[in-house]
């Protein structure tokens, strides 16, 4: 069974929950902080474990304006994940684990993407 971790900002919360439920209905094992991370647990360790876990075959990056801003400014949980994910992406010539999902575009139709994905 495929296993995915979803990286997102809370601004896409509803979209993420709908996507997670759809993936589960198609037999995908979904790891989501909202479901897995318990109060008091180290969120940075959780994110690092998810990104580096060999059983997690894909990391879906839900890209909207807020996610891109937080990633580029290294703020909040998104900023923490960016530090981990960008190292993985830059460290490998060919990578297929990290998949950006475009959740929002600007008024000109441009995708909101963090700098490390562009």
Question: What feature does the model see in each segment?
Answer:
Residues 92-103:
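Gly/Pro- and small hydrophobic-enriched strand-loop and loop-to-helix capping segments
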Residues 14, 58, 80-81, 100-101:
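Helical anchoring/docking segments at protein termini
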Residues 14, 108-110:
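Short, charged/polar "capping" segments at the starts of alpha-helices
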Residues 1-65, 91-94:
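Conserved N-terminal substructure of TIR/SEFIR domains
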Residues 65-92:
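Conserved TIR/SEFIR loop-to-helix hotspot centered on a Trp-containing motif
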Residues 110-117:
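Short regulatory helix/loop adjacent to the ATP-binding pocket of P-loop NTPases
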Residues 65-66, 101-108:
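Short beta-alpha junction loops
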């Amino acid at each position: 069974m495929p296993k995915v971790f979803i990286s997102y900002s809370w601004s896409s919360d509803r979209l993420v929950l709908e996507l997670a439920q759809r993936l589960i209905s198609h037999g995908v094992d979904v790891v989501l902080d909202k479901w897995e991370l318990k109060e008091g647990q180290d969120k940075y360790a959780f994110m690092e474990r998810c990104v580096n876990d060999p059983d997690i075959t894909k990391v879906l990056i839900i890209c909207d304006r807020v996610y891109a801003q937080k990633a580029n400014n290294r703020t909040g949980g998104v900023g923490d994940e960016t530090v981990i994910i960008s190292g993985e992406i830059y460290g490998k010539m060919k990578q297929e684990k990290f998949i950006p999902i475009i959740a929002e575009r600007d008024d000109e139709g441009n995708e909101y993407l963090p700098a490390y994905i562009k």
